[in-house]
Amino acid sequence: MNIRPLHDRVIVKRVEAERTTASGIVIPDSAGEKPDQGEVLAVGPGKRDDNGKQIALDVKVGDRVLFGKYAGQAVKVDGQEVLVMREEDIMGVLVA
């Protein structure tokens, strides 16, 4: 992927959630909501504090993260749709 995020921006690829209910009903794409979790593809260097010191991000490439329904800006890079969001839009990291 040819994109390098700036400051506290994070590039996230949506990860599709399970499309079948517990009772076996398949949910069509048109009826389901967009997934609210994804995989971090790239991270920026971090933002700067009031003294100019750079603050590193908590998330790293490969993390599986949770984010809000309306978080980030969808863009296409190399034909692939990804989200560009601030680290503060990420609610948490899923731990296996």
Curated annotation (Swiss-Prot):
Q: Which GO MF terms are attached to this record? A: ATP binding; metal ion binding; protein folding chaperone; protein-folding chaperone binding; unfolded protein binding
Against InterPro entries, the record matches this protein to:
Chaperonin_GroES, Chaperonin_GroES_sf, Chaprnonin_Cpn10_CS, GroES-like_sf
Concerning CDD domains, the annotation shows:
cpn10
Alphabetized, the UniProt keywords read: Chaperone, Cytoplasm
Entries under SMART domains matching the protein: Cpn10
Location relative to the cell: Cytoplasm
List the GO biological process terms: chaperone cofactor-dependent protein refolding
What GO CC terms are in its UniProt record? Answer: cytoplasm
> What's the subunit arrangement here?
Heptamer of 7 subunits arranged in a ring. Interacts with the chaperonin GroEL.
Q: Which family does it belong to?
A: Belongs to the GroES chaperonin family.
Its function, per the record, reads: Together with the chaperonin GroEL, plays an essential role in assisting protein folding. The GroEL-GroES system forms a nano-cage that allows encapsulation of the non-native substrate proteins and provides a physical environment optimized to promote and accelerate protein folding. GroES binds to the apical surface of the GroEL ring, thereby capping the opening of the GroEL channel.
**What protein name does the entry list?**
Co-chaperonin GroES
Q: Which organism is this entry from? A: Dechloromonas aromatica (strain RCB)
Give the gene that encodes this protein: groES
